[in-house]
């Protein structure tokens, strides 16, 4: 037995990143693994996507520094609305000890510093997919 589940459901991922190149790279990783991505360039676009879907996403993959807010605030809004994703991953150029602690306090499961090691992200997405009910 390989240790892999027989089948996993694709994750519904809310991807929030204002940098076009980073957004495309992250989207490509998720799509290559077969996941559904809902892409926003800023916090308010992300909140609009969540409102239109009217259900929690499996995973939030968000930059911390956004033009109209930050990833910490976004996760707080989602949590307060009862729409917190099962997993939340912060991706940022902000990588001080204080930033990492703030991400943890906000409820992020991981905080990756840019540039992101895509193999590590792939492993976390695979692990998250195994945890989602069919």
Question: Model regions: which residues?
Answer:
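Non-catalytic signal-transmission and effector/linker regions of two-component phosphorelay proteins
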Residues: 1-14, 20, 27, 117-134
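Two-component/phosphorelay signaling modules centered on CheY-like receiver
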Residues: 20-39
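Acidic, metal-coordinating helix/loop segments flanking the phosphotransfer/catalytic sites
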Residues: 39-59
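Short amphipathic alpha-helix used as the core "switch/output" element in two-component signaling
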Residues: 48, 72-85, 125
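Active-site residues of response regulator receiver
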Residues: 63, 92
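The feature encodes the CheY-like receiver
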Residues: 67, 96
């Amino acid at each position: 037995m390989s240790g892999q589940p027989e089948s996993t459901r694709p994750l519904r991922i809310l991807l929030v990143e204002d940098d076009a190149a980073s957004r495309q790279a992250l989207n490509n990783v998720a799509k290559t693994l077969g996941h559904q991505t809902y892409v926003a360039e800023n916090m308010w676009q992300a909140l609009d996507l969540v409102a239109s879907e009217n259900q929690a996403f499996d995973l939030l993959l968000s930059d911390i520094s956004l033009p109209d807010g930050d990833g910490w605030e976004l996760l707080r809004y989602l949590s307060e609305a009862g729409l917190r994703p099962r997993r939340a991953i912060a991706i940022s150029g902000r990588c001080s000890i204080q930033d990492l602690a703030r991400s943890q306090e906000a409820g992020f499961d991981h905080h990756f510093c840019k540039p992101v090691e895509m193999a590590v992200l792939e492993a976390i997405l695979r692990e998250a997919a195994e945890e989602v009910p069919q």
